[in-house]
From Swiss-Prot:
Gene: hemC
One GO cellular component, as annotated: cytoplasm
Reaction(s) catalysed by this chain's protein: 4 porphobilinogen + H2O = hydroxymethylbilane + 4 NH4(+)
Source species of the chain: Bacillus cytotoxicus (strain DSM 22905 / CIP 110041 / 391-98 / NVH 391-98)
Organism classification: Bacteria, Bacillati, Bacillota, Bacilli, Bacillales
NCBIfam families in alphabetical order: hemC
Protein name according to UniProt: Porphobilinogen deaminase
Amino acid sequence: MRKIIVGSRKSKLALTQTNWFIDQLQALGLPYEFEVKEIVTKGDVILDVTLSKVGGKGLFVKEIEHALLTKEIDMAVHSMKDMPAVLPAGLTIGCIPKRVDPRDAFISKNGKSFKELAKGATLGTSSLRRSAQLLAARPDLQVKWIRGNIDTRLRKLQEENYDAIILATAGLKRMGWDNDVITEHLDESLCVPAVGQGALAIECREDDKDLLQLLAHMNDAATERTVAAERVFLHKLEGGCQVPIAGYATLQENGKIKLHALVGSTDGSVLLKETVVGTNPETVGLEAAERLIHQGAKELISAANKEQQ
C-alpha cells in the first residue's frame, strides 16, 4: 500500500481543506494511505504588511512547491486563488474538485448591509480587488487593511475599528461559519470574485502517473473548464495580488463558458469590465484579456505595480 504525503499550510482553513480532500480520496476505497505534512509559507509569517507589497501570488505556495519538487511531499491542496498563473517546471494541477460558492461575503458589525453602511464607515480587507470594486460603488468608505486567519479577522471586526469586513464565502463555509456570521453575499455585479475563488487546486509532480490516475477520480469537469478560462485571462494580463484584477466564469446550460473579467485602478476610480462567452476556455480567457488591454488594462496594471513598490 502506497503512503501519500500531503503538504498543507498550518492554518485551520488549509488543514480543514486538506483533510476534507483526503476523506474524499479514502472514500474511493483504493489501496492508499495518507499522511499530512504541515509546511510554513512566507505568507503565513508576514502578517504586518499587505500581500501586494510582499510579492502577492505565490506567497502561500512557494515553500510547498519546493517540497513537491524535492519529493518531501507527494501532493498539496491549495486554494486555487492563491495559485500563480504559471506553475514551476515539473509540477501540474492533478485535479480540481467541484467548486463551492465563489462569492465574497460581507460581514458587518451591526448587521447593516453594504448599501446601509454609514457614510465614511471603515471596511476591512487585505485585497486590492475587493477594495477597488467596493470603493467604486461607495467612494465615501474608508478601507483599512486587515490580515490574519478567519477567526482573527472576525475577532478584529468586533474588537477593533472596523464597521465591516469582506471574506471569501467558500472559506467561511469550509470552516463551519456561514449564515450565522454573513450579513450578505456580494453579487458578482458589485464585486467580481478572484480568479479561482471557491475552487481547490490539487498540485503534484507531473511524472507521478500513479497519483495522477488517483486524482482524476476527483476532478470536476465543469470547474476545470471555467477555472481554466479565468487562469488564462490572469496569465495573459500577468496580474497578481498587486493589481485589482478579477475573473469569474460560469458554465451555461448550452455548455458555453461565460467569463466576467475586470481590471481596476487601486482607488476604484476606474473599473474596466468585459463579459465574454465561448466554448473554448483558452479562447474565452484570451479574448477577455485582449478586450481589456484594448480598454487600457496594461496601463492600470503598470500604475498599480508602481504604487506597490
